[in-house]
């Protein structure tokens, strides 16, 4: 890379080992950035398969060719491993911006840390998770977790209601459903009160 202090070349065979390890762990491909070194600009010395020598004889090119030949042999024996996550965590940029602007919560609050609390639980148990926005379809998932979803877009709650009615499990947390998509507080009933079967009487 062009941004690190030291860039050690991989030892002979290490590229092959890490590539086959990725395949063994479920990857469907081995990809490289970049294929050819540029002649100028900031990435002209960035690692690449084809170097400035434009040769097929150097070690990097030879190892990549070796990997390609072996992957071709394996291609008929390895099944596609494109798993589809059954769990989704909602991380929404507009929600993050609105939370960052809200002057009613502690400055110690960190939206990304809040999301990671939930993600870590699934990760430690080996459960795959998709990170999605409020705009995505929910019906593809068995469980949707929406931590601190302060901002609710106009049609979002209808989507959640349809998801729950279809048998989906929806988990949300504190400080959710407070403002609409223009960052204005909801007046009267909050959008998820009927869905969750609760109401907020007081905030401390």
How would you name each of these model-derived features?
Residues 1-204:
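Carbohydrate-binding surfaces of carbohydrate-active enzymes
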């Amino acid at each position: 890379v062009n941004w690190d202090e030291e860039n050690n070349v991989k030892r002979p065979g290490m590229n092959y080992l890490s590539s086959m390890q990725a395949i063994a762990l479920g990857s469907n491909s081995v990809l490289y950035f970049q294929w050819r070194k540029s002649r100028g600009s900031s990435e002209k010395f960035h690692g690449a398969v084809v170097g400035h020598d434009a040769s097929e004889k150097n070690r990097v090119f030879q190892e990549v060719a070796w990997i390609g030949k072996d992957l071709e042999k394996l291609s008929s024996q390895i099944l596609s491993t494109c798993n589809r996550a059954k769990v989704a965590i909602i991380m929404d940029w507009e929600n993050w911006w609105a939370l960052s602007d809200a002057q009613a919560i502690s400055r110690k609050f960190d939206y990304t840390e809040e999301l990671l609390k939930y993600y870590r639980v699934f990760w430690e148990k080996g459960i795959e998770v998709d990170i999605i926005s409020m705009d995505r379809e929910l019906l593809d998932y068995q469980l949707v977790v929406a931590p601190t979803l302060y901002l609710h877009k106009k049609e979002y709650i209808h989507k959640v209601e349809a998801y729950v009615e279809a048998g989906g499990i929806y988990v949300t947390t504190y400080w959710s459903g407070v403002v609409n998509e223009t960052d204005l507080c909801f007046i009267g009933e909050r959008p998820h009160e009927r869905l969750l079967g609760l109401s907020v009487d007081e905030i401390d």
